[in-house]
Amino acid sequence: MTVKFNVEVPCEDLKAPELGHGGYEGLRPRNETLLKGSVTAPGRRVLSCDILVEHDVPITMRDGCKLYADIYRPTNAPERSVPAILCWSPFGKKFNGIDSLKLMTPWNLGIPEGTLSGLEKFEAPDPAEWVDRGYAIINVDSRGAFDSEGVMAIMGTQEAEDGYDTIEWLAKLPWCNGSVGMAGNSHLAIIMWFVAALQPPSLKAIAPWEGCGDLYREQFARGGIYGGDLFDHLIIKYMLRGRNGMESFKKMFQQHPLANEWWNDKRPDMKKINIPTYITGTYTNTMHGMGAIRGWLEVNSPDKWLRWHPYQEWYDLWGNQEGRAELLNFFDRYLKGIENDWESTPRVRMSVLRYGEKEPIANVVEEDFPLPRTNYRKAYLTADGALSLDQPAPTSGSVSYNSEDSRDLATFTYKFTERTQIVGMPKAVLYMRNDDFDD
């Protein structure tokens, strides 16, 4: 690794890649053409065009480390004509959306059979859709993932430099038109903040759909409590595979629970991002919401959009046809230079969840975010478990819960007397004192 810190970075082992796990086929560099009208398996999306697939393409980083990618692109396209969409993550470039939905969600998230081809990487766009529109999809196994060399470093400067090197390598390939974008959600969105902040010359646009903006404060140490259960018990256990181990968030928190140089390296400087950016966020995911908001507030480009939607993130990526069409139009504008009136897309759209109603209110066009017309109200916690708009007189009382029982809660209730919309960034100011300890 080329990136060094003033603190020792603890590592942990990963399970080695296993044939068949997460679609892993072993390291088998080869080219093949998938034919129009074919399917990768029964019930999957029918390919609408021929697709050239380059498997296990090596990409050498600035420190000599070699990463591997699968490239899906149009057959017989003229030289220098195809823009590239980079999809970056450690989950396995052949671990597809169909298998991931079966592993982690009920009822396929409501995404109809035949929507996905099985070529799509987990949390990434489907090559079956994008190649037919004249794009190449590049699915990379990041540093340390599967057969890619090195120690896995999740986010931070090391991964950002790897992304930079990959983008500039892609832009020089004979089929590429020199324009590279990044797409995907969750992990694939988070890494975009880091890579784009380094300003690779050939990175022309990004679409971070649901991307956390600070791994320490928004994920692993939120509220000062270790929050890595999802990462430790699902992602590491079932999804990550590699041969050289990975940086350990859990061990780092045990050794350094307060922010240090390494933790701060997991927070991208979004103010250095200066390219067109299409951001999404949602109420359904508490991990990524603040990253989407901070991205909207801090990205230093006049060409930025925020769509706050009411769906689960993977449904929005794969099942929301309107959203997919918008994403194609966004990249048509900034990777192909097509004058398609994308700029008339509303800069800010919000959604409102309606209690007791099946359908949310979506795509509410707003001037800005936070909403300029917001009426900010203070609500006070009371000793009898209420939220009061009037500051209560000082009194003593208690509301308690069992912190060892995940089902137990301390609740404070406010009853609305008129129809009200809550859109924005609520915050709590809490005054604390511990009489038994010197804290």
Show the residue positions of the predicted features:
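C-terminal, loop-rich substrate-recognition/catalytic regions characterized by aromatic stacking residues
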Residues: 2-29, 309, 316-439
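Catalytic-loop region of hydrolases
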Residues: 2-87, 93, 387-400, 404-408
